[in-house]
Regions:
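N-terminal interaction modules that seed assembly of large macromolecular complexes
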Residues: 6-62
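Aromatic-anchored, charged helix-turn/loop surface patch used as a conserved interaction hotspot
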Residues: 42-89
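Amphipathic alpha-helical binding modules
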Residues: 93-143
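Surface-exposed polar/charged interaction patches
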Residues: 15, 19, 45, 66-70, ...
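Intrinsic-disorder-associated interaction segments
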Residues: 9, 53-56, 69, 85, ...
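Histone-fold modules and their flanking histone-like tails across chromatin and transcription assemblies
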Residues: 1-3
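Short, surface-exposed, charged/polar-biased interaction segments
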Residues: 29, 33, 37, 56-63, ...
């Protein structure tokens, strides 16, 4: 989820400490609605945040393992193989995010390579992983 929960909580504290009642009841009511929505999103993220990141990282690594044998660029192939062999050492969100960001940067590199080299099957596999990632991160406000 972006922004991350610490950012949402800090913003909430700023809103509450900033004297929202000074601007009138309508403004305060709007701010409280916004804060309530942010807290609901934070609760949902808290519940599923680690699971989403672990699944994404696993899917990306599996994709790299599948793509690497077809890559002719030696440097990219080595990066894909190294990333595919990696694993998440911690379930801390900050550590999972760091791994996820690094994997996503390499995924972008792999996608550019696939597009530049007409590797349509690789492109389709990449898009399937991206679609699954987007579906996992979808946030619904209802129950």
């Amino acid at each position: 989820m972006n922004p991350e929960i610490p950012t949402i909580l800090a913003l909430t504290m700023q809103r509450l400490a900033g004297g929202i009642t000074e601007h009138g009841a309508a403004f305060a009511q709007g701010q409280m609605g916004l804060i309530g929505m942010m807290m609901t999103l934070s609760a949902k993220e808290y519940e599923r945040g680690a699971e989403i990141r672990v699944a994404e990282n696993s899917d990306i690594r599996a994709l790299f393992a599948a793509l690497a044998p077809e890559v002719k660029d030696a440097a990219l192939k080595a990066k894909l193989e190294a990333a595919a062999a990696g694993k998440d050492e911690s379930l801390l969100i900050s550590k999972l995010n760091a791994n996820n960001y690094a994997l996503r940067r390499l995924l972008t590199e792999a996608q550019v390579y696939a597009e530049d080299n007409g590797a349509r099957a690789a492109e389709q596999r990449i898009w399937a992983v991206l679609k699954a990632m987007a579906a996992r991160r979808l946030v619904q406000l209802g129950p």
